Amino acid sequence: IKPGMRLRILGNVAPDRFNNDEMTLTPTGIMKIEVPERKDNAEVKRVELHCHTKMSKMDGLTPMEDLVKKAIKWGHKALAITDHGVVQAFPFCYNAAKKSDLKLIFGMEGYLISDREDIKEGIDQESVDTKKKATRNKIKSNHIIILAQNEVGMRNLYKLVTISHLRYLNGRPLLPREVIMEHRDGLILGSACEA
């Protein structure tokens, strides 16, 4: 099995008693099938404003260069890179697109929370005393798309990424609404998928 292969697998799905009763597929037949090449034949091309690369933890699989090459091949005029809470894909995407007419829109899918008061400060002293694993304070968040409109927006986007990772990391980099509003200049905000 190699990356990019498409397989049709026939088998039985049943709980695996050796793996905490997780549902497991026991294959009875595996067949390699051809991967049809996808095309964008639309006369008017769309602009993807919410796109993940492999830099999105647990959500993106596509290498940055492949994503940019596909957008160019399909004749798209622009593409927004919006990984979850990070911006590491930007230089790779920029280098892949710099000899083309593709306009890259740099952004991020953030984890919006309504208030800083939702965040538990300090350490869980009971866990320290009893040597139990500390329980993470589950904070409800909503996803938000943040796009940089200009150079000021890029600086503010970088500030938001830094602040979310250094001050509000709670399993994922959280962004309080008031912090976003403090660094709002040059940014376009939009809704995203459900958290």
Range-by-range predicted roles:
Residues 1-195:
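Phosphodiester-processing cores and adjacent nucleic acid-binding clamps
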